[in-house]
């Protein structure tokens, strides 16, 4: 989706930058926040990975995928279009498909026929440019047999990144559990519960959960993941507002129509190869900055307080100004002037909320990173 909250919805195969490198041979999973075209790294929040067989709560290694949940893949089975991605996870023979709305990542997983032991891994420890201690805390609640909510707070390049989420499955959960290997001592009375086996609230800074589903009907599993930087209620509202009652195919069609409209703002007369180069480049100009605001107008500011956008205003984040001031923003002034105005207003709000009273230098997810110069 152009300028959506994810930045770029894709598989995670590489541990730096945007999380994907063409030379990689394995996919770790599918997370919900990414950069596009950066040299530095962060994000990769809320990783989902389907698998069959015995549940594995370790990532595994690229040269020994049997030790974890990651899978080999082949570029011959990949398909990437604006608004859609698919690939076969070779270790499991699972077809993975992705699409999105402005604030919701949408998955569809087709498991092999007659699968009996299908699982979804939800890894809240994973991150791009990951290291021990990056996840400060994570929480996961099973609201009902179809719905999860939760959050995680990380300290990476973004000094304090709040990611709230709501997950909706198309099939009921049969069984679930988790593993939390944190070493922080906890002396409260929650320790009397066994969080690892069907306990509906899981908490920790090294939390990986699994969910079992019945695939005897041979139907694919669809998963919708709403995101918010404000709270879980905001993530649920975003999920409902943008995807309620819609199938994967319907959302994919809407998303691709939106991309078609966006990319049609410039028309060129050229051969096929030149058109591919041109429109791929134009596509990349429409990924960042990213929407950073709930459907009800609330957003987390640079001061980490919750603000309410004025009517007609959309708050954006991911301003790599030293990259974009000379190319991206002049182009947006020409082809998308109303959106460019929203970018400027977001920058001005950044200034007003900044204790240093500065415009964005390199900001993302409600944080100023002080990387490079932009003015």
Where are these regions (language model features)?
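Accessory carbohydrate-recognition regions in carbohydrate-active enzymes
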Residues: 1-329, 333-375
């Amino acid at each position: 989706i152009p300028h959506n909250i994810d930045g770029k919805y894709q598989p995670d195969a590489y541990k730096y930058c945007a999380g994907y490198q063409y030379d990689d041979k394995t996919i770790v999973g599918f997370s919900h926040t990414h950069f596009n075209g950066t040299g530095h790294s962060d994000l990769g929040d809320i990783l989902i990975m389907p698998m069959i067989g015995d549940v594995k709560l370790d990532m595994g290694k690229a040269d020994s995928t049997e030790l974890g949940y990651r899978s080999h893949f082949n570029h011959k089975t990949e398909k990437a279009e604006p608004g859609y991605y698919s690939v076969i996870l070779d270790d499991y023979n699972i077809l993975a498909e992705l699409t999105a709305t402005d604030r919701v990542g949408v998955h569809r997983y087709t498991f092999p026929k007659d699968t009996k032991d299908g699982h979804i891994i939800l890894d809240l420890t994973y991150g791009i440019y990951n290291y021990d201690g990056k996840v400060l805390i994570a929480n996961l609640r099973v609201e009902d047999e179809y719905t999860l909510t939760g959050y995680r707070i990380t300290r990476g390049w973004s000094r304090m990144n709040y990611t709230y989420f709501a997950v909706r499955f198309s099939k009921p959960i049969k069984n679930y559990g988790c593993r939390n290997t944190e070493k922080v001592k906890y002396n409260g009375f929650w320790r009397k519960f066994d969080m690892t086996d069907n306990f509906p609230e899981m908490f920790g800074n090294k939390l990986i959960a699994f969910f079992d589903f019945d695939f005897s009907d041979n139907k694919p599993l669809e998963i919708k993941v709403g995101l918010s930087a404000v709270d879980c209620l905001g993530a649920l509202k975003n999920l409902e507002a943008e995807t309620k009652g819609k199938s994967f195919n319907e959302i994919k069609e809407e998303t691709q129509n939106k991309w078609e409209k966006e990319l049609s703002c410039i028309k060129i007369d050229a051969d096929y190869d030149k058109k591919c180069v041109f429109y791929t480049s134009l596509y990349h100009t429409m990924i960042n900055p990213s929407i950073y605001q709930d459907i009800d107008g609330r957003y987390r500011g640079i001061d980490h307080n919750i603000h309410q956008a004025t009517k007609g205003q959309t708050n954006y984040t991911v301003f790599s100004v030293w990259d974009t001031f000379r190319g991206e923003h002049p182009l947006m002034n020409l082809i998308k002037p109303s959106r460019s105005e929203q970018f400027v207003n977001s920058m001005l709000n950044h200034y007003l909320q900044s204790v240093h009273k500065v415009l964005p230098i390199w900001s993302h997810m409600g944080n100023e990173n002080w990387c490079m110069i932009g003015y």
